[in-house]
């Protein structure tokens, strides 16, 4: 009887810990997915030619700003999103999101 109770307790602890880990991983995935969505939206807004090439015509009436102020604004944008990305534990992301996060990180670092 004691062995059955101990086995049941261990099983419940395992299930609880697995659930907690999955919840943490899902939270990291949701956090990254929101960041990625915000990044893409801002990227299309600040690079209207790319938006048009990709079929998003909301910014067709604009051109990219290549002035010093525009370059500084894009640099600040890249730094902001890189810092937000660094705050996410990539090890907790799903495989697909982990790959996307690494691609995003490489792109942000390249643009700095």
Question: What role is predicted for each listed range?
Answer:
Residues 17-112:
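N-terminal maturation segment of proteins
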Residues 1-9:
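Bacterial N-terminal signal peptides that target proteins for export
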Residues 8-17:
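Bacterial N-terminal signal peptides
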């Amino acid at each position: 009887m004691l062995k059955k109770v101990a086995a049941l307790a261990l099983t419940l602890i395992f299930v609880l810990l697995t659930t907690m880990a999955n919840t943490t991983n899902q939270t990291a995935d949701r956090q990254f997915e929101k960041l990625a969505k915000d990044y893409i939206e801002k990227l299309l807004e600040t690079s209207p030619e790319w938006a048009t090439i990709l079929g998003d015509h909301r910014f067709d009436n604009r051109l990219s700003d290549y002035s010093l102020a525009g370059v500084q604004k894009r640099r600040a944008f890249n730094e902001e999103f890189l810092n937000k990305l660094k705050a996410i534990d990539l090890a907790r992301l799903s495989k697909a999101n982990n790959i996307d996060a690494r691609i995003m990180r490489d792109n942000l670092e390249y643009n700095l």
